[in-house]
């Protein structure tokens, strides 16, 4: 058992993701001046690199091939690595079952830079082109038939976008490091496989042969997923035999080779489960790593209590230092830039993936929020665990995503169609809102039921699967919720007010949803909390069911109201402002702002929502990526209010543009994407 320490300096919150986290991050600098600042930078870097993952997937997905006719059951990867040059000699055994009758061939992914020396097994011949190995089988396979192939290959592993693949780099200036970075579709950059999230072999064996040597007086070792079964020494070489016996997607298979210093803990949970925590750090950062993982067992205990015991408890949980990049939730062995305390919130995120991402994997990247939104939400749950509900609420406000696009990704083959931060931030906020709709007990029971469901454990799930679990647990129809928050875009923009007859206590609450004025969904159906403050110092909270564009709710309150808070716990992703009752167009913004254009990306006309807090001479200008002004949308005095400003892109070519809104000393810029 482990005790969570709750002091400020042991539980700082990292507020970083995208630029709208900055203000709250500054507030926490006052409370935790050192740690919140360093964590903020760490998480910011992590998020940027995670966004790059999706762009890599979008490009890689274009060359993927139909592989639905077979199911991989087992891989055995045998790697022979040079420590002095980026060169790989290897072989792979793949065992599979045919899914369709008369299966004549199977296709595996492997980058074209490699040379295939031979293939044996159930094969008559093969072709290798366009990053695809097409193996013609030695007979027609019927559904359920088992087969195998063994591929011998060699070459220099290519690097994806200058960053990922099987990387040969150094740490401490000149000490070698070989490490794989394979998410979300890049395992085939270094080994043949059926890449992507859709296929999980039952187990993977990884043998890594390296020179038997030391660097800076420290032995070079090789680490991977699962359990180290054996180390064989022969002919001045060592072979590390790693065994992953749980189902795993190919891009979570990992290797890391360096002169690591390893240290260990043993986790003992409340259910009696016990497993090793194995850490691999560089000598120069060992002390910081040992300090940085002190609270990790407490995070494991928290997530085990919420979602069920750690899903890979028969093996381990490990973390391996990179010294660059961000982090990847490789199954049982997360790779991470550094394990020091400044990256602890990244460690929490990656740990959560062991339940949501590794154990239960999104069926395809349309449902990517089931991986990333869940892990991001777990950051907020850790904040709540260490700092209470107020800290949780504050953390959630750093995740408010108020741009366009759907959480269910529509187009995963087009980089412009992937709204990267939406699956992290809005995905997490969807769970926050679902908690508000269901209540704590039912919400957390739904998450636990989802994690325990045998249809998804060590397999795949879709958004529809998650919805069914929530509906079954809650005994509620949640179509309204998922339809508007997952499959539709944007958010409600509330105008509200109230009045009270102090003699009778009769109170009217007026709510109008304003977003239809900007071409968006006219009504979001949600329960809304309303908090009334009374002159005697008391308060009460009531919940109303808002399902119309304009609604008035009447109730009797026995005390005189002194104040009113709309959605005090911020359960709803929204904007809200006081409006004059009966004058629906009289919305008075409290601040200047330029909202993200919609649609975005767009072809033809896109609209901007402009909020003007006071009468001002304003300018709204469009610039291309080179800084050339291409359009003036507004250049005049405007009165306070909310305006919709269209831009007809005309003959402007596809590309990235910027919309700049200025009013006096205020200035704000939005990036927009024009796609022809």
Regions found by a protein language model. Give the residues of each.
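Hydrophobic helix-coil surface modules that form long, contiguous segments used
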Residues: 90, 195-348, 377
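Acidic/His/Gly-enriched intrinsically disordered linker/tail segments
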Residues: 367-368, 372-437, 454-457
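Amphipathic alpha-helical substructures
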Residues: 100, 420-509
